[in-house]
Amino acid sequence: LREVDLIAAEDTRHSIKLLNHFDIKTPMTSYHEYNKVEKAVYLVDKLREGVNIALITDAGTPGISDPGEELVRQCAAAGIEVTSLPGPAACITALSMSGLPTRRFCFEAFLPSERADKKERQRILDELKRETRTIILYEAPHHLVGTLTDLREALGNRPVSLCRELTKRYESVMR
């Protein structure tokens, strides 16, 4: 992060703590769900000018249920090469800690919220009833009870591993 000219961060308030800890003075700009399209245009323009940019997220891997997909898409369309530093996405970390079968799995990211799109949520849950592979989902804490209830109704007595705060101080796994 010291070697790039600009850091695009999901939440600059969060990322500044990490940068300060390591005394990294690289300028930052925000890149998140709510500005991803217009900010990607800006970042692609900067890349065309020869600016080296790193994209970081609060946790996990950019583009895997975190901002990044739009920027990579626009870079590809502009013929700009993108590289990724290997590191675990939360879904892979959770899978490896779950105790569930890891050979074949299905990653669904976040289910649509009931409030936003109840029919689409139910359609996905109905599809998951037929899924035999280990299923990985993300969920926000304030939706967790409702989602677990819906999963129990849709999937029955299927084994579950609930992982939270992975790689952080309060990491926990419940099976």
Q: What residue ranges belong to the model's regions?
A:
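Class I S-adenosyl-L-methionine
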Residues: 2-85, 93
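RNA substrate-binding interface of SAM-dependent RNA methyltransferases
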Residues: 6-9, 13-24, 91-100, 105-106, ...
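Amphipathic alpha-helical transducer elements in NTP-driven molecular machines
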Residues: 12, 40, 88, 118-125, ...
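Short hydrophobic/aromatic-enriched beta-strand-loop microsegments
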Residues: 25-33, 82-83, 102-109, 157-163
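Short, well-ordered secondary-structure micro-motifs
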Residues: 41, 66, 94-96, 147-149, ...
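A contiguous loop/helix-start segment that scaffolds small-molecule binding in enzyme catalytic cores
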Residues: 51-52, 133-134, 138-175
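Short beta-strands and strand-loop turn motifs
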Residues: 53-58, 104, 108-109, 132, ...
